[in-house]
Amino acid sequence: GKGSVSAFLRSMAEAAGLSCHVYNSPHLCRFNERIRLNGNFISDDELIDVLSEVEGVNGSDPITFFESTTVAAFLAFSRHPADLLILETGLGGIFDSTNIVPDTACTIITPIAFDHEQFLGSDIATIARQKAGIMRSGRPSIWARQQPEAYAQLQQQARQLCVYVQTEGPVSYTHLRAHET
């Protein structure tokens, strides 16, 4: 799933000598696991500082737990230089708080299944349309094997955005243009 993919990417980046920040959810044992700064989990002190800062700036405006955690992570990331940032979506899709980054290098879509149905939809095609919302125009997107109805939705969005798509198999990209069928 998403967590395994982000762990694998982080491992490859660090093995290549890159400094890397990672945002994951949910955590396994400690909340600090959600925010990794250059290979290390955020310290308790820094976590308290960024969460307090987010709470102070936000005031009494409505904000979800995931949104405040995401903002705290971005705040921590902004204070530590890194070569690479790996973001794992929470709900995964159009309305996910991690989806505010306008210019991603690449997106990865793991197998789409029934999850977060109250937010994403009650059928695979609807969920896939939501998850396709992380793709960016002209940027590569790597997809795990998908159910046919999910694949069709991903492909439709990829065409609209002229996304380079890599699915299972050797590394080569298919550039889906809006006029292709």
Model-based region annotation:
Residues 15-102, 120, 148-149:
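ATP-dependent carboxylate-amine ligase catalytic core
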